[in-house]
């Protein structure tokens, strides 16, 4: 499962979601600006407060990193 922790105003979050959509990859989008529980989960997993944070089957990517995303979705 892929989960993206994002905010509505984050341009890198938008790029991440557009990239996954272009590859026909399903994901869950979580708005951490509104959901405090999810924000705390994101911080616990990534040790970061910036977005996007991408959780691909338990592997955490901070920021939009095509190479890392591709490596993990090809597994």
Curated annotation (Swiss-Prot):
UniProt record, GO biological process: cell redox homeostasis
Q: Which Gene3D superfamilies match?
A: Glutaredoxin
Any one GO molecular-function label of the UniProt entry: electron transfer activity
Family matches, as PANTHER family: GLUTAREDOXIN, GLUTAREDOXIN-LIKE PROTEIN NRDH
Record-annotated Glutaredoxin domain positions: 1-75
User: What cystine pairs are annotated?
Assistant: 10-13
Organism equals Clostridium pasteurianum
What UniProt keywords are attached to this protein's entry? Answer: Disulfide bond, Electron transport, Redox-active center, Transport
Matches recorded under Pfam families: Glutaredoxin (PF00462)
Q: Which family does it belong to?
A: Belongs to the glutaredoxin family.
Q: SUPFAM superfamilies, from UniProt?
A: Thioredoxin-like
Taxonomically, the superkingdom here is Bacteria
Quote the protein name from its UniProt record.
Uncharacterized glutaredoxin-like 8.6 kDa protein in rubredoxin operon
Xref: InterPro entries:
Arsenate_reductase-like, GLR_AS, GlrX_YruB, Glutaredoxin, Grx-like_ET, Thioredoxin-like_sf
Asked whether the UniProt record includes Acyltransferase among its keywords, one would answer no
């Amino acid at each position: 499962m892929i989960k993206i922790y994002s905010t509505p105003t984050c341009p890198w979050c938008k790029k991440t979601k557009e990239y996954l959509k272009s590859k026909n990859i399903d994901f869950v989008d979580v708005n951490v600006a509104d959901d405090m529980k999810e924000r705390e989960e994101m911080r616990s997993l990534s040790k970061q407060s910036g977005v996007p944070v991408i959780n691909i089957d338990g592997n955490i990517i901070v920021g939009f990193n095509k190479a890392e995303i591709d490596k993990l979705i090809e597994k």
